[in-house]
Amino acid sequence: MTRTPAAPEKHNRDSASRYKSGSKISTLFAEELVERSAIAGFGRKDLVVFDNACGTGAISSALHRALGDEKTRTWKLTCGDVSEAMVEVSKQKMIEEGWQNAEVEVVDAQNTGLLSDHYTHVFSAFGKMLGTQGNGIMLTSISAFNLFPDDKAAMEECFRVLQSGGTLAVSTWCSTVWATLIQSAIASIPGDLPTPTTEDIFGLYNKNWADESRVRAQFQQAGFTDINVTSVKKEYTVPVQELAEACKISLPHITRKFWTQEQRDSYEAEVPKAVLRILEEEQRGIGLGAMKAEAIIATARKP
């Protein structure tokens, strides 16, 4: 398959560094999702994989590491995202990592236009939103199925494009340290500001993917069988400044939903300061904190 030309450079050094650091937590969950999909043990035929709402390509990258050359020499990988900017990022990663037999294209997860009964595996992990922070482009990670305006249509598309016996693997957030820190920071600021609940934050666009029972129900309603749903935690240590940066990236999406414009103008800039103050008080001069999150991992089979 013809390799795609390199994507234009869109990050300065500072923003790229912060993006790479913040993407580690998503990478850990991508590896978990790939492992739980059992794709490494698939032996019936050549793999045909769709990385749905691929974002920065974390799943496709994890797949290459897990499967190795023996399987990727003969597989077909399609990476799709509705965001042209995310497609460019994934194309660049494809070039840098030498993905085999892969293509990256703009695809609407709710109406993919892809072949029916075609893929052995469909993955849908954490989606990415682009935003600006300082002088660079920044990304925030939100569950792809929380982003879809019509999540039922997206599930129907996953079911349609899978072969009989094919596997769908999905991950969604259920708790993150950056959401908790934002909540604490807002509550600490005078002004009686609306403080969204955890369910509010992870249900910004729809609330069907915030807990295990709801996720299981979505798979059942779409017609899947052999449904496995579990929650998984990941954690690693980072400088407190990185935790504060993670909050900055997500904050505008939260305040846009739950605050008035007047509240945003008056108080939004105070939230990162409050986050850093909370972290420094908690760590008592150590300067390190825990980047931690919990995600729902779900896999199922098309009959």
Swiss-Prot record:
Q: What Gene3D superfamilies does UniProt report for this protein, alphabetically?
A: Vaccinia Virus protein VP39
Family statement drawn from the similarity comment of this UniProt entry: Belongs to the class I-like SAM-binding methyltransferase superfamily.
Q: What is the name of the protein in this document?
A: Methyltransferase ktnA
Instruction: Report the source organism.
Output: Aspergillus niger (strain ATCC MYA-4892 / CBS 513.88 / FGSC A1513)
Biological processes annotated in GO: methylation
E.C. number: 2.1.1.-
Q: Which PANTHER family match?
A: 2-METHOXY-6-POLYPRENYL-1,4-BENZOQUINOL METHYLASE, MITOCHONDRIAL, METHYLTRANSFERASE
Q: Name one GO molecular function term.
A: methyltransferase activity
Xref: InterPro entries = Methyltranfer_dom, SAM-dependent_MTases_sf
Q: What function is annotated for this protein?
A: Non-reducing polyketide synthase; part of the gene cluster that mediates the biosynthesis of the bicoumarin kotanin. The non-reducing polyketide synthase ktnS first catalyzes the formation of the pentaketidic 4,7-dihydroxy-5-methylcoumarin from acetyl coenzyme A and 4 malonyl coenzyme A molecules. Further O-methylation by ktnB leads to the formation of 7-demethylsiderin. Then, an oxidative phenol coupling catalyzed by the cytochrome P450 monooxygenase ktnC forms the 8,8'-dimer P-orlandin via dimerization the monomeric precursor, 7-demethylsiderin.
Q: Which cofactor does it need?
A: S-adenosyl-L-methionine
Pfam families on file: Methyltransf_31
The alphabetized UniProt keywords are:
Methyltransferase, S-adenosyl-L-methionine, Transferase
Under SUPFAM superfamilies, the record lists: S-adenosyl-L-methionine-dependent methyltransferases
